[in-house]
């Protein structure tokens, strides 16, 4: 069963949290997808973004949909990013001019249909952090293709993530304050997060985890 989905901007700590849940809770992690066809499409996309953007995003959406179905048939599954996260990047592509409005409508029609027939996780975790925090973590892990991206791109991405989250979240939600909480380096923060996850899986509504406190957030 798909227990948990972890969302957040690039550098928020999604993959790190999934790895922690695998190690500490015995969950099965589902990570970013890659295969030969995806690599071939990406290569063409970087050579001609406007030509290959829709092809790339539809292929990734299809792969994510299959991944969600597979996760739902797996005991204690946790996913690194969801179709909502994919939509964030598609909206960015449209904003940057690589996806035409009519192409976006095509993508959105597929997205809506697949979302409606996809299982809802028991808990959605959204790691919310500032651009400053995300950039510090991006620089720390040292991926050249991320470091060379202009700050304005990451600012837009954070904004799109916040907007998409407010639009699509439903069910049980845990928002982790990624600026205050460091569950990677700080053991007490990690314990705090794991305890909050255990509690929120069985709690209804939206909850926010700040440093030292878990509070209920009214919609």
Residues of each region from the PLM?
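A glycine- and Lys/Arg-enriched "phosphate-lid" helix/loop adjacent to the NTP-binding pocket
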Residues: 89-160
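A basic- and aromatic-enriched beta-loop-alpha substructure that forms the phosphate/nucleotide-
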Residues: 64-102, 125
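P-loop (Walker A) phosphate-binding loop of NTP-binding proteins
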Residues: 9
């Amino acid at each position: 069963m798909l227990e948990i989905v972890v969302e957040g901007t690039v550098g928020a700590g999604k993959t790190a949290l999934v790895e922690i849940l695998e190690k500490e809770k015995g969950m099965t992690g589902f990570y970013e997808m890659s295969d030969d066809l995806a690599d071939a499409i990406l290569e063409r996309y970087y050579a001609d973004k406007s030509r290959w953007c829709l092809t790339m995003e539809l292929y990734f959406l299809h792969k994510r949909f299959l991944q969600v179905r597979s996760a739902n048939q797996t005991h204690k599954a946790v996913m690194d990013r969801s179709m909502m996260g994919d939509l964030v990047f598609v909206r960015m592509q449209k904003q940057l001019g690589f996806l035409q409005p009519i192409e976006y409508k095509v993508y959105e029609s597929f997205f809506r249909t697949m979302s409606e027939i996809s299982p809802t996780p028991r808990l959605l975790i959204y790691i919310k952090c500032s651009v400053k925090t995300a950039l510090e973590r991006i620089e720390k892990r040292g991926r050249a293709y991320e470091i060379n991206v202009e700050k304005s791109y990451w600012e837009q991405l954070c904004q799109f993530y916040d907007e998409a989250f407010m639009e699509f979240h439903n069910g049980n939600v845990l928002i982790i304050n990624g600026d205050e909480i460091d569950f990677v380096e700080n053991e007490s923060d990690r314990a705090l997060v794991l305890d909050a996850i255990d509690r929120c899986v069985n709690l209804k509504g939206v909850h926010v985890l700040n440093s030292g406190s878990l509070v209920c957030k009214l919609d």
